[in-house]
């Protein structure tokens, strides 16, 4: 078996690899080696039809992608974006598959270990909205519901802060689940960016920007 680094799609050959340490062998020099079964580690075997290659072989879904292998030992592994997006930049994860090798008489098994290298995936910032009574103050504390002095109570789509709102349509997100989202700049529409200090909040060292009808901190 072999270990390969893979981002996106990766192809290889478990029988005729160029690495001597990973090459499958048979003491019977005249025997022809073929892959007859494949499974994800811990799963059930699926048969691999004779005469197949990685283009028309048997596909098995792993944790982070799908491996397709032929009887000739050739295989292709395609990472699934949704599954692999949670692997952060600089981190890695493995998908392990077990294949059965046959010479027509005897069989043995070995592993294919695919190492998926994480990358910094694009995060998504959603537009946010606030509603306020004239002459009042709207406060959206970190992780809390918005509230406004006066008779208006902002709930639903206007609840929560800009990172962690209760409305999924307004919630900012990052596929790299181990990353921490922070606000780094703020500006009024059409204005210039002002830096937001790390560790600040709206009521402690936050950045104030004056808009057309009021000031946002």
Kindly give the residue locations of the regions a language model identified.
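Extracellular ectodomain surface segments
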Residues: 1-60, 124-206
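Acidic, turn/loop-rich segments in luminal/extracellular domains of secretory-pathway
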Residues: 49-120, 197-217
């Amino acid at each position: 078996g072999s270990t390969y680094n893979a981002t996106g799609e990766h192809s290889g050959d478990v029988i005729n690899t160029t690495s001597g340490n990973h090459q499958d062998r048979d003491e019977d020099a005249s025997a022809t080696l073929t892959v007859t079964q494949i499974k994800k580690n811990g799963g059930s075997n699926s048969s691999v039809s004779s005469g197949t290659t990685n283009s028309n072989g048997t596909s098995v879904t792993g944790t982070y992608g799908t491996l397709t292998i032929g009887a000739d030992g050739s295989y292709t592994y395609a990472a699934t974006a949704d599954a692999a997006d949670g692997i952060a930049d600089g981190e890695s994860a493995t998908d392990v598959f077990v294949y059965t090798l046959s010479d027509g008489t005897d069989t043995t098994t070995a592993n294919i270990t695919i190492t998926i290298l994480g990358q910094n995936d694009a995060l998504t910032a959603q537009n946010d909205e606030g509603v306020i009574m004239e002459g009042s103050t709207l406060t959206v504390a970190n992780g809390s519901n918005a509230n406004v002095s006066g008779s208006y109570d902002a709930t639903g789509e206007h609840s929560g802060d800009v990172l962690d709102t209760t409305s999924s349509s307004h919630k900012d997100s990052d596929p790299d689940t181990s990353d921490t989202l922070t606000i780094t700049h703020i500006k009024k529409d059409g204005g210039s960016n002002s830096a937001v200090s790390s560790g600040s909040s709206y009521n402690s060292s936050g950045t104030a920007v004056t808009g057309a009808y009021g000031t946002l901190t």
